[in-house]
Amino acid sequence: RGSSGLYSGASSAGGVKTCPSEIEAGKILPLRMSWEDDWANYGVEENSVDVAAASRSVITHDLEDSLQKLSAVACEKVCVTVGTGFSPRVDMRVARAMGLELERHNDALFVFGIASDLGYEPTVSYIHSPRTKSYISPDEAYHSLLRTRDYLADTIDQISVEESACRLRNFLADHLVEIEEDGTKRWALDQSRVVPWAFISWDVRV
C-alpha cells in the first residue's frame, strides 16, 4: 500500500492551514483525502508546503492531474516513488522458475515524461528494497507463490497451469528452507527478493 505526505519546515511560507499548531509542534496531521478531491477543502492549498511526496500511490486514472496537484501545493520540491517494471508483489526468480512471462508496466517512464512535459527537470535515482516473506508451511508457500500466474502477460503464449505448478514444486523443493521467526518455525525462500523502485524528484521553482 502506498502513501502520500506533505512536509512543511520552519522556513516554509505556509503550512497545512487546517491545524497550524500541529505543524509547529512537529506532529503528524493525518488527512483522509483522495487524488480526486479538492485539496483546498482540507487546508492543502497552493504553495502551502515545502515538499510534496507520494510513495507508491501516484499511479492514478489521471497521472498528469495528480502530478500537477503535487507540484501546485509544493513551494520547493516534489518527490515520488514508483515501480520500474514488474509488480512488486511477485518474485521474478519464482516466475522464471515457473516458466512464466509477466506483464510489465514501467511507471517511472510515464512519471518522468509527464513531469518533463509540465516544464520541470526531473531527476531519478533507484532504490533496491530487499523483501523476505515467510510461510507457516510448505503448502502455504506453494499456494501463495502459485498466484504468480495472476500477473501473466496477456500477449504471450504461456505454459499450462499444470506445467508451471510442477515447476514451482520442483523449485520449492530446492529453495524453500526452514527458519525461526519470533520463536516459531516458519518457511521462506533461501534468497530475499529485491524490489526496484524509481525515486523521481523535481524542483518546482524552475
Regions found by a protein language model. Give the residues of each.
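Class I SAM-dependent methyltransferase SAM/SAH-binding core
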Residues: 1-42
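A short SAM/SAH-binding and catalytic strip from SAM-dependent methyltransferases
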Residues: 36-65, 71, 84
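Solvent-exposed polar/charged
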Residues: 71-72, 117
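Conserved beta-strand signature within the Rossmann-like core of class I S-adenosyl-L-methionine
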Residues: 74-93
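Acceptor-substrate binding/catalytic loop of class I
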Residues: 96-108, 133, 154-158
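Short alpha-helix
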Residues: 103-125, 148
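Conserved Class I S-adenosyl-L-methionine
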Residues: 123-206
